[in-house]
Amino acid sequence: MNPKSALAIFAHPDDIEFAAAGTLLLLRERGWKIHYFNLLSGCGGSVQMDASTTAATRLKEAQTAARMLEATFYPPIAHDLELTYTVELLRCVAAVVREAAPSIVLTHAPVDYMEDHMITCRLAVSAAFSHGIPNFRTDPEREAFFRDVTVYHALPHGLCDPLRHPVQAEAYVNTTSVHERKRTALAAHESQKHWLDVSQGMDSYLVSMDEMSREVGRLSGQFEHAEGWRRHLHFGFSKSKIDPLRDALGGDYRIDASYAVGLQRTL
């Protein structure tokens, strides 16, 4: 079983490209196998097509983006705004975790601007937690594996929580060298340009990603483009406080010293 395996579990088609594709590409360059799993079909992402047509369109776009990232693709398991934290869906997510057998799981922030993101996060965390619990049955059935898993949470959309408080990254990944490839993968989601213009006032989803990437880079104090991450508590996931992203990415990974000081005060 290859320990160099990373799994991104996000809500909608294009969420991975917005928040995590740069980190995945850097891992891929370092010989990691990367896995791409959106839980939702994206069926709500259009004011021009009906739900089934939108879902089919977005499935093709996501598959194209995953190929661009050289990632293994897993199909969605629910529709937009219909995701709930149920044991049935947890069994589905846990099956993908066991199939991918990741050392690193990337997912949404625990608190984000919409429920789909937060429920995806909860399912991803519980599925990762269950990776070494053979008595928890997955759907389809997959064997448990016994290796450390570390979960990292992306920064929330807009870099703040739903009550508008800024959210600080624990660590920054330098995505400058892969930013154009990340942008190209996001551009594969062509159907989203009009939808995001109308629904969320994004002048361009590509420009919005560029701006967020540069802002996170600015916050890093070091990188032009960056993605920010916070590491989940290791209890139940690994034997000790490990940081495999740091170990894998070296100089492209910068820990925010002020965040680390805050952890020392609270633990």
What is the predicted role of each segment?
Residues M1-A100, S130, K239-A248, V261-Q264:
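Active-site rim/loop-helix segments in enzyme catalytic domains that contact anionic ligands
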Residues M1-L7, Y85-L267:
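Metal-dependent de-N-acetylase/amidase catalytic core
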